[in-house]
Design a protein with these regions (language model features):
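Compact, glycine-rich, soluble single-domain proteins
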Residues: 5-86
Length: 86
């Protein structure tokens, strides 16, 4: 599976800065999945579980409010809260 650069930044600092194969987050309109090559998009985040696939392993986190941005193949999450649960 192809990968992309993912950066997750909260008001407390950087939670992740590296490659990922997939990220799924709750936007305000429902869950949104991002893979490599996704079109550019900026959307507000809702509150819910986030799933990130890193090196083939699925990691989960609580993600709450903020923004998701996909620009030029790079994905940036700017949530108010992001806590890894697995």
């Amino acid at each position: 599976m192809n990968s992309f650069h993912l950066k997750i930044v909260t008001p407390d600092g950087i939670c992740y800065d590296g490659n990922a194969q997939s990220v799924t987050v709750r936007a305000i309109t429902g869950y949104l999945g991002i893979l490599a090559g996704h079109i550019d998009i900026t959307t507000p985040l809702g509150e819910g579980e986030a799933r990130v696939i890193i090196d083939g392993e699925t990691c989960t986190a609580h993600c709450s409010h903020g923004l998701l941005s996909v620009q030029g193949g790079e994905v940036t999450l700017l949530p108010a809260v992001f806590r890894w649960t697995k």
